[in-house]
């Protein structure tokens, strides 16, 4: 039988992960932009093509791209006192002459409807999640070793 005793001081562990959370927000945002440029959903699948009438109206054939707001996500940064980074297309900004926000429109596209195919464009891809978890795990391991 092997036994081991380890002492460490919990007060030495820095639980401020705001830097890592902000980096995670940037990883998600960059991954999101890259996927939409390729026309891929959050699972890496090709999204449903646009209808001919939509292409004619927009003047181009890029899914979920009009103003750029849906692909250029906003990252509300984490701080030492607020350990949360929020990533969204826009929760406050409304479309001109409307009460509808970018998040509202994003939800509509995410769910789809009878005349709009479901396009699961928003979320965290497996690749981004893996990279984020690895980064945060390494940081926590470093803090525990230093304690």
Residue ranges and their predicted role:
Residues 1-147:
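Short, Lys/Arg-rich flexible segments
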């Amino acid at each position: 039988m092997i036994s081991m005793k380890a002492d460490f001081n919990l007060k030495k562990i820095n639980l401020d992960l705001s830097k890592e959370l902000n980096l995670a927000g940037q990883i998600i945002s960059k991954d999101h932009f890259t996927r939409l440029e390729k026309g891929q959903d959050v699972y890496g699948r090709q999204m449903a093509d646009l209808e001919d009438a939509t292409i004619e109206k927009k003047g181009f054939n890029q899914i979920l791209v009009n103003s750029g707001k849906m692909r250029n996500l906003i990252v509300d940064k984490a701080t030492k006192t607020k350990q949360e980074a929020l990533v969204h297309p826009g929760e406050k900004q409304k479309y001109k002459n409307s009460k509808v926000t970018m998040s509202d429109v994003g939800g509509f596209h995410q769910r789809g409807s009878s005349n709009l195919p479901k396009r699961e464009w928003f979320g965290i891809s497996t690749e981004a999640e893996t990279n984020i978890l690895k980064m945060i795990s390494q940081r926590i391991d470093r803090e525990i070793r230093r304690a």
